A protein has these predicted regions:
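N-terminal export/targeting signals for secretion/compartment entry
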Residues: 1-52
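Non-catalytic, solvent-exposed segments at the cell envelope interface
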Residues: 43-47, 61-343
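Core hydrophobic alpha-helical transmembrane segments of single-pass membrane proteins
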Residues: 51-61
Length: 343
């Protein structure tokens, strides 16, 4: 099949559930300050990199620390990822639902994280998966050249994996990305189960026929399978929009991290199981080795939770497809300018 033809059809093939209604989407866009990052206060220092990005920090940094038995010894050679190295760091985080039944893999979550050279603050920008964008020609990890076209932004991952997603984000933002981190959703379920489940509190009961998810109102503990359905469902919870789903994911991840930290103190064996599941859930491109991970962890030691900002790419309903979102180019350019120049 021609790559461009495949791309044009991905809008229908990739979405197992339609986007929220245009009315709800418009209302959310009106309610939010366009492009204005909001402060996010996280529950503990363990949650440093803000919401979804926090999970990645835990997944790639904590296993590295464990390999060194918790001793973050300084490396002998200067590391470009360390604070004071004069190097800022941009990391693209993706949540992927790689399919076991032969279907196309998709990137469900996209977050671009910026660590300035002094590591005094962290910026994380979420990219709605309903964004309709131009996907440039790119090469896969195996070196295959795939043609581009216009399509939903998560189609880039289906066409060419992490390299094509990185190329697409770089072309849209003008930001150079140092590393791409992919979190496998199958591993996500194992992580939740390794902790014995994660607690959530629902203001009302949730029933979704598409996923089979059925949850009562109130406080409850979710196992891995139900947790994954909970963070991905769009109907019957919130206003049905992609933006509402992103916020729910963020709250769940913060709860997961609080519980992981608690298990570290109360049940070390269970915590080690969690780390093992986490280590098996993440891949990086280009690969981040242990010294790089240690340097990132050390550089964030003095970064307070109040120094973390989280925002979403400013968008509006696409004039070409009412079920998709178009970026506000000027506002997005101003937002991502912070990723290219130190303040």
């Amino acid at each position: 099949m021609d790559d461009l033809k495949m791309l044009r059809g991905l809008g229908r093939e990739l979405e197992h559930e339609p986007p929220g209604s245009l009315v709800r989407q418009r209302q959310r866009l009106v309610d939010a300050a366009r492009g204005r990052p909001r402060k996010v206060r996280l529950p503990s220092r363990w949650a440093l990199v803000g919401m979804v990005a926090v999970v990645t920090a835990a997944l790639i940094v904590v296993p590295a620390v464990l390999l060194r038995k918790g001793d973050l010894r300084p490396v002998d050679q200067p590391n470009p990822f360390a604070a004071g190295s004069g190097k800022m760091l941009n990391v693209l985080i993706m949540g992927s639902d790689a399919r076991s039944r032969g279907g196309p893999a998709r990137s469900d979550t996209l977050v671009l994280v910026h660590l300035p050279a002094d590591r005094k603050h962290v910026r994380a920008v979420s990219v709605p998966r309903d964004s309709l964008v131009r996907i440039p020609a790119c090469r896969t990890a195996e070196g295959k050249l795939v043609s581009g076209g216009t399509g939903p932004i998560n189609a880039a991952f289906t066409l060419g994996g992490a390299p094509c997603t990185q190329r697409t984000i770089e072309s849209l933002t003008g930001v150079r990305i140092d590393s791409t981190v992919t979190i496998d959703f199958g591993g996500f379920k194992k992580m939740v189960d390794a902790l014995g489940g994660v607690e959530v509190t629902l203001p009302k009961a949730v029933t979704d026929k598409r996923t089979g998810l059925s949850l009562p109102a109130g406080r409850q503990r979710l196992d891995g399978t139900r947790a994954l359905a909970y963070v991905r469902v769009r109907h019957g919870l919130g206003d049905g929009s992609d933006l509402s789903r992103v916020e729910r994911q963020q709250r769940f991840m913060a709860s997961l991290l609080r519980q992981a930290k608690s298990q570290q103190l109360r049940n070390p064996v269970r915590f080690v199981r969690f780390l093992a599941a986490a280590a098996g859930s993440v891949t990086t491109h280009p690969r981040l080795d242990v010294p790089a991970l240690e340097a990132i962890a050390r550089s964030l030691e003095k970064t307070g939770a109040d120094a973390v900002t989280f925002s979403t790419v400013p968008v509006s309903p696409s004039p070409h497809d009412p079920n998709r979102l178009a970026w506000d180019r000027d506002a997005a350019a101003a937002l991502f300018a912070q990723f290219k120049a130190e303040n």
